[in-house]
Amino acid sequence: MKNIKANELQTDLDVYGNSPHIYYTPNVQHHFTVAFTRDIEQPEFYDSVIHLLLTAEEGTTIDFLISSYGGHLDSLLSLRGALQATRADVTGYLMSQAASAAGMLLLCCHNFVINEFATFHAHTVSYGSYGKGDDVKQQVDYITKQTERIVRSIYDKILSEDEQNLLIAGKEFYFEDHEIRERL
């Protein structure tokens, strides 16, 4: 196996200069750690992470360190697609807070590790709309329909069907570490 200095690998994996840091741990099998420790940014911010997931070989392990208040849904959905397609085994480590899109990212992982005092916050989408009246109504109807599909597809790991209905109706859910573990 080729020895790669950490800063050389970081240069290779961080082509945009400000993407999430990806750390490679040389071992018999490939092991990577990706930190999600700020707001979930625009989709292009995660190009290197998505590339890592889509090109990972079987036997590769990837750890997502999650401590974030959430962010862009389109980025979460891009990461989710790559998580569904990857051959790697991905573990989500809830380090402290997983809110909104960050909580959904945790639920998209294959395995979970929940730190003591970690918290989880679930809610539906936040957005704004503008334009002509009929256009705004069509957009709101579309986003409402899409949001329901996303909620039912992702939150089913932690919320019952009745709780999913309440979430869609506007209720927010907050869970502490012991509650998260019980539900997962």
PLM segments and residue spans:
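N-terminal organellar transit peptides
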Residues: 1-104, 108-184
